[in-house]
Amino acid sequence: MFITFEGIDGSGKTTQSELLANYFKQIHGENNVVLTREPGGTDFAEKIRGSLLKDNIDPISELLLFTSMRYEHMKELILPALKEGKTVICDRFIDSTIAYQGYGLGVDLSLIRDLHKLVEIKYPDITFILDIDVQVGLSRAKDKNKYEEMSIDFYHKIRKGFQEIAIKESNRCNVITGIADKDNNKVYSEIIDVIRKKKKGMQPL
């Protein structure tokens, strides 16, 4: 099973991806769960992650870099793990590119999707979109990057992008709302409830 977490900065993706990974490890064993992230996930991608999140480059160049990193990530880590029957959990994936580069920076959405289709990027089985108020999210964000220097309007566009993705991809995407008013355990419980509905036979919390 391939599961991804999406949302604006400060929405709690990293925390929830770690909690879910630990849950699956308790069920299936430490070696049967892969927790990864984007940008990153491979030696190649991790080497340029810092520059990509700090340096200002053209949106199309940025898209091409993200896509090449994602292709490498899929080929070297995600697909081999899935073929071995492992559960893969990823902090950000294709939907972040659609939201940030597409809705936020104005790159044509069809170009993003066509490019990913060309290199045969696999879509996740389940995606959790953690929806949070923009200003609350930015105040909670721990990892500072170039995007946080953008205007509030930029982040509103990204949030809207994630919301529209969830509507268009409703079979795959699950939106967790009210993040700012819930503690991590409450959000985690809602995520586990969704997992149970998607995959029967999981042991109770």
UniProtKB/Swiss-Prot annotation:
Catalysed reactions, as listed in the record: dTMP + ATP = dTDP + ADP
Pfam family membership, one: Thymidylate_kin
Disulfide partners: none
Keywords attached to this entry: ATP-binding, Kinase, Nucleotide biosynthesis, Nucleotide-binding, Transferase
TM ranges: none
InterPro entries named among the record's database cross-references: P-loop_NTPase, Thymidylate_kin-like_dom, Thymidylate_kin_CS, Thymidylate_kinase
Cross-referenced Gene3D superfamilies: P-loop containing nucleotide triphosphate hydrolases (3.40.50.300)
Gene Ontology cellular component list: cytosol
Binding-site residues, ATP: 7-14
A Gene Ontology BP annotation from the UniProt entry: dUDP biosynthetic process
Domain of life: Bacteria
Entry GO MF terms: ATP binding; dTMP kinase activity
Protein EC: 2.7.4.9
Family: Belongs to the thymidylate kinase family.
Alphabetized HAMAP family for the sequence: Thymidylate_kinase (MF_00165)
Protein purpose: Phosphorylation of dTMP to form dTDP in both de novo and salvage pathways of dTTP synthesis.
UniProt-recorded name of the protein: Thymidylate kinase
